[in-house]
């Protein structure tokens, strides 16, 4: 009788563990994709470039619609400061930053060219790093029962990179036409060929669309 009770207790424990695991996996699958935006890098040579304003524009665009979890720019800057960095560069740094912010992806955007006078020129490059298999089985009984392990000894998660880049030159007829088409659905930014702020947001939109197209499960 005692043996039967022990077996039943073990079975109940296993079922409870499996139930918790399934519930956790369902919760994780329902969570929106998290993307943190690093401060935009100015590689254009233009000294008057406003990096914080550019970063805010990228964050605002990604957060629009609510389908993604996008930490505020000041929170990302604070996390980088805590790490002693101006931006994350190596896979290990990107992994640490993603952990600190609770996201799966880190987006780095650079301006490669910038002319703030009409006809505007904005060159942008973006790299979206996504972590893969950070923890394949969070309730692995072997790992759960193991003695504590130094986190620093754990290998960094594999990173997959998605890249996109383009120079948006308003002198190009196709680019100018596309900017006008974009403006028709943007309240408050209806003059991208006359206002640099609107033109930069147009360029950011098109860059992010290209990046998300290369990552089908992202959505935006």
PLM region spans:
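Envelope-exposed proteins and targeting segments
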Residues: 31-34, 66, 102-107, 120-125
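Solvent-exposed loop/turn segments connecting transmembrane beta-strands
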Residues: 46, 113-120
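Solvent-exposed coil/turn segments that connect beta secondary-structure elements
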Residues: 40-43, 75-76, 111-114, 125-134, ...
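Bacterial N-terminal signal peptides
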Residues: 7-18
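Acidic/histidine-rich, surface-exposed loop or edge segments in extracytoplasmic proteins
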Residues: 32-44, 74-79, 182-187
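C-terminal/domain-edge helix-coil "capping" segments
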Residues: 20-31, 117-121, 132-220
């Amino acid at each position: 009788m005692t043996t039967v009770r022990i077996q039943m207790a073990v079975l109940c424990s296993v079922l409870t563990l499996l139930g918790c695991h399934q519930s956790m996996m369902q919760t994780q699958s329902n969570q929106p994709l998290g993307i943190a935006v690093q401060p935009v890098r100015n590689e254009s040579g233009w000294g008057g470039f406003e990096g914080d304003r550019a970063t805010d524009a990228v964050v605002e665009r990604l957060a629009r619609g609510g389908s993604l979890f996008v930490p505020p720019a000041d929170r990302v800057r604070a996390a980088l400061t805590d790490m002693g960095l101006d931006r994350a560069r190596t896979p290990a740094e990107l992994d640490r930053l993603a952990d600190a912010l609770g996201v799966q992806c880190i987006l780095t955007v650079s301006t490669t060219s910038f002319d703030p006078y009409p006809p505007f020129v904005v060159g942008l490059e973006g790299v979206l790093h996504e972590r893969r298999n950070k923890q394949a089985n969070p309730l692995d009984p072997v790992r759960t029962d193991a003695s504590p392990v130094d986190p620093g000894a754990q290998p960094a998660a594999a990173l997959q990179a998605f890249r996109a880049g383009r120079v948006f030159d308003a002198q190009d007829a196709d680019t100018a036409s596309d900017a006008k088409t974009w403006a028709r659905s943007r309240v408050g930014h209806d003059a991208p060929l006359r206002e640099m702020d609107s033109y930069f947001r147009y360029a950011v939109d098109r860059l992010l669309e290209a990046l998300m197209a290369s990552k089908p499960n992202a959505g935006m």
